[in-house]
A protein has these predicted regions:
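Single conserved hydrophobic/aromatic residue that forms the stacking wall/gate
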Residues: 1-11
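Structural motif corresponding to the intra-repeat A-B loop/turn of tetratricopeptide repeats
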Residues: 26, 88, 128, 163-164, ...
Length: 278
């Protein structure tokens, strides 16, 4: 009985620590504040510091000092400190944190959250003409999939090509972007920028290949830019894309998914149609 009660307490403590961590990463500082008292003492100090950082409350420095040494390197605490510094406009001290952390997916816990900070800090560095540092900050994102990964790879390629003037460095980033997206708007963007990259390298064959690829998506901005690169004299031809025969149209409107999209549109809820229309 005593042993199982002791184990139960351990599980309960672990559960509270996990919940506190979840609330902190999600920025839910009210929920976090409510459960801090149920945490073991060391973790109370850690999550009090995180709660103050997230809510931008008073006594930040004092709260961080009180965090026990063994928890000072907690990735969540580092992330909250980074975000706090970035919001205060302290780019240099934000860089100290980014240079100090283990840049692995395992350590970062939520590399997608870190990416948002990297992206904002990267743009600040571009504005200050610190192009090499901006590239390092943006490209060391430690992600391998998802929309944030695609965004990070595109931005890394863009900095490499447009600011560092290193098309060979940009090439892989734009390929990573292209092969991780699905929508025409993104596929055309990836193809166009690969076309530009190969153009800068002086590889006409690959440049044309990617511009042609981009020009398949004429209803998008980058599709039209690609078209202008390979067929500057030809006007846009969307006619072939616009023709639908009557039989196909009738069958199309009988499909269940089409009816759902139609209904969502009618209810002004078309933000939910994106996933169906992919």
């Amino acid at each position: 009985g005593v042993m199982s009660r002791g184990l139960g307490d351990v599980y309960k403590r672990q559960d509270y620590i996990k919940r506190a961590d979840y609330y902190a990463w999600e920025g839910k500082h009210w929920d976090l504040k409510r459960i801090i008292r149920y945490l073991p003492k060391d973790y109370q100090l850690l999550y009090t510091a995180r709660q103050i950082l997230i809510s931008r409350g008073y006594g930040v420095d004092e709260a961080i000092k009180k965090v026990p040494q063994k928890l000072k390197n907690d990735p969540g605490l580092k992330y909250d400190r980074l975000k706090w510094r970035r919001k205060k406009g302290r780019v240099d001290s934000s860089l100290e944190i980014l240079n100090d952390i283990q840049n692995t997916k395992k350590y970062l816990v939520r590399p997608d959250k870190w990416w948002k900070e990297r992206s904002i800090i990267g743009r600040s560095l571009l504005y200050k003409k610190k192009y090499n540092t901006a590239y390092k900050v943006v490209s060391k994102h430690a992600m391998s999939e998802g929309p944030e990964y695609a965004e990070a790879e595109w931005m890394s390629g863009w900095i490499a090509l447009s600011f560092l003037k290193k098309p060979e460095l940009a090439e892989n980033h734009f390929k990573n972007f292209y092969y991780s997206v699905n929508y025409p708007i993104s596929l055309s963007r990836g193809a166009y920028w690969l076309g530009r990259t190969y153009e800068k390298i002086g590889d006409k064959e690959n440049s044309n290949k990617w511009y042609f690829e981009g020009s398949n998506y004429l209803t998008t901005y980058y599709g039209q830019l690609s078209h202008m690169k390979v067929k500057p004299q030809e006007k846009f031809e969307l006619d072939k894309l616009m023709f639908v025969d009557d039989k196909y149209e009738q069958e199309f409107y009988l499909k269940k998914l089409v009816a759902i999209v139609d209904l969502l549109d009618y209810l002004n809820k078309d933000k939910y149609t994106k996933h169906i229309l992919r």
